[in-house]
A protein has these predicted regions:
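Outer-membrane beta-barrel "beta-signal"
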Residues: 248-259, 443-457
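Outer membrane beta-barrel
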Residues: 70-96, 100, 109-233, 240-259, ...
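Extracytoplasmic loops and strand-loop junctions of Gram-negative outer membrane beta-barrel proteins
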Residues: 66-68, 104-110, 193-197, 314-321, ...
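Detector for outer-membrane/organellar transmembrane beta-barrel domains
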Residues: 253-254, 262-266, 271-396, 457
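N-terminal periplasmic/intermembrane-space "pro-region" immediately following the signal or transit peptide
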Residues: 18-88, 220, 457
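Bacterial N-terminal signal peptides
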Residues: 6-15
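Flexible, surface-exposed loop regions and adjacent strand-edge segments
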Residues: 100-106, 159, 187-192, 241-245, ...
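Positively charged n-region of N-terminal signal peptides that target proteins for export
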Residues: 1-5
């Protein structure tokens, strides 16, 4: 390792190891019996022994593992500690969006269009095991710098896991409700930088705190089950939560050929020689109330909305003077993908039902039923260097049918998957989703340009 070699060179430069280079007169004064000079061969042998000893005792401290594992800070008989960072800088231009939009109830709102550069997110990860390799931990500091100065800028979280065997792992802490593919551990191996198509963003759950069970079953089948506090807890304090603890989310992911690329993500960066496929299923159900909803600017904000972007739990949501206090969210997602020779074609279907309302005043409906789909296609036009991609999604809702289209390029200057320059043009039609850390705005109509430099180690 580099640092061990450097340490060996440092020791070599110390005077007691360099005595052989003293003037011959000094050596003669000591006489044969007191001569402590080392020959070149003896000195090199000592350096080799010290380096071998340090390599054994220091283990793998300082090692770097690509793919998000980061740098090894500690490796002892009592545990390990790895440190990694995910961050990106983004230039965002929304000036070509319409300045106002009108929702399905005739209410006109003015949009705050952006044209700025942000170090949009910086996430710090600390992970390893302690006392027993089966008992692992992961803690993170998660920042949203587009909200700099607000209470929602920084989130601290993590989880504690125990592995009984590959088929059975249990844990508690902050985790994804794995309702869609983008919440099944694929991040950050996406075509886009920290951005979903609007059909995924609209239907999906988010992060919760709870218990979870996961594992790898036979025939390359993976599962995860979560029982948590709510659909989206980041930015929600414990006092706001109801006392039900009834959010349930589960997923199955099947890669028949066994290797679908890093974390089962999008894009065929690996250039598979043979056809590989992936299939997924997500189920989520949660009883939600208006007290337990995150703010509009919260990290990984996931609000239950009407398809025109109106938040279900806001006052006068349906323009009748009434409001919804509680509702039950149920969502199903199905997805499939195929990769070969640098090509990736992936699609997903979503259906969401929100019902069992508890209301104050008059609400004109007793349930919401929306569905949508998306497709993404990409090609590595220069292996390990340059990728192009296209995406389209559409939502079919009771209060509008929004859609979006994207075209983008990823350039990998060092031929490493997790350091890239991304440039993208996006078209929005009546976007029902948006918050500061993503490029969409609620009600957005028109084009958005962005370019991002992403780094993960």
């Amino acid at each position: 390792m580099r640092f061990l070699r450097s340490l060996g060179l440092l020791l070599w430069s110390m005077p007691w190891l360099c005595a052989a280079q003293q003037p011959a007169a000094d050596a003669a004064q000591q006489g044969p019996a007191g001569d402590r000079t080392l020959t070149e061969e003896q000195r090199q042998s000592l350096i080799d022994r010290l380096t071998a000893l340090l390599d054994e005792e220091g283990r793998r401290i300082g090692d770097f593992t690509a793919g998000g594992a980061g740098f090894r800070l500690a490796d002892t008989d009592f545990g390990t500690l790895n440190f990694s960072i995910w961050a990106y800088a983004r230039y965002l231009n929304q000036k070509n969006l319409d300045e106002t939009y009108t929702d399905s109830f005739g209410r006109t709102k003015t949009l705050d269009l952006r044209n700025d550069l942000q170090l949009n997110k910086v996430n710090l990860y600390f992970k390893g095991w302690i006392y027993d390799p089966k008992f692992s931990y992961m803690f993170f500091v998660w920042t949203q710098n587009a909200q700099m100065g607000d209470g929602s800028q920084v989130v601290l979280g993590g989880g504690l896991d125990y592995s009984f065997k590959p088929q059975l792992n249990v844990g508690a802490g902050v985790t994804q409700n794995p309702g869609t593919r983008s919440l099944r551990g694929t991040f950050p191996f996406w075509h886009r930088v920290d951005t979903r198509l609007i059909a995924d963003e609209y239907h999906r759950p988010s992060y919760t705190t709870g218990f979870y069970v996961y594992g790898n079953l036979e025939s390359n089948l993976q599962y995860k089950v979560v029982l948590g506090n709510n659909l989206s807890q980041l930015g929600v304090n414990a006092v706001q939560l109801d006392a039900e603890f009834n959010t349930f989310s589960a997923s199955l992911n099947w890669s028949p050929q066994g290797d679908y690329g890093a974390r089962g993500g999008w894009g065929d960066f690996e250039e598979h020689e043979e056809l590989v496929t992936n299939f997924g299923l997500g189920l989520t159900q949660s009883r939600e109330d208006r007290q337990s909803q995150p703010g509009e600017s919260t990290i990984e904000n996931s609000q239950i909305r009407l398809s025109d972007g109106t938040r279900l739990f806001e006052d006068n949501a349906f323009n009748t003077g009434g409001r919804v206090n509680k509702a039950t969210y149920k969502m199903l997602s199905l997805d499939a993908g195929v990769k070969r020779h640098g090509f990736d074609v992936s699609g997903a279907y979503y259906v969401r039902v929100v019902d069992d309302f508890e209301t104050e005043g008059f609400i004109p409906v007793d349930q919401l039923h929306d569905w949508g789909w998306q497709i993404q296609v990409s090609k590595m036009v220069v292996p390990k260097k340059l990728q192009v991609y296209l995406g389209y999604s559409k939502i079919f809702g009771e209060y509008g049918d929004p859609h979006d289209q994207v075209a983008g390029i990823n350039w990998y200057p060092f031929e490493e998957r997790l350091l890239r320059l991304n440039t993208e043009l996006m078209y929005l039609k009546n976007s029902p989703v948006g918050y500061p850390s993503v490029p969409m705005l609620v009600g957005g109509n028109g084009t958005v340009f962005m370019t991002s430099l992403e780094m993960v180690f």
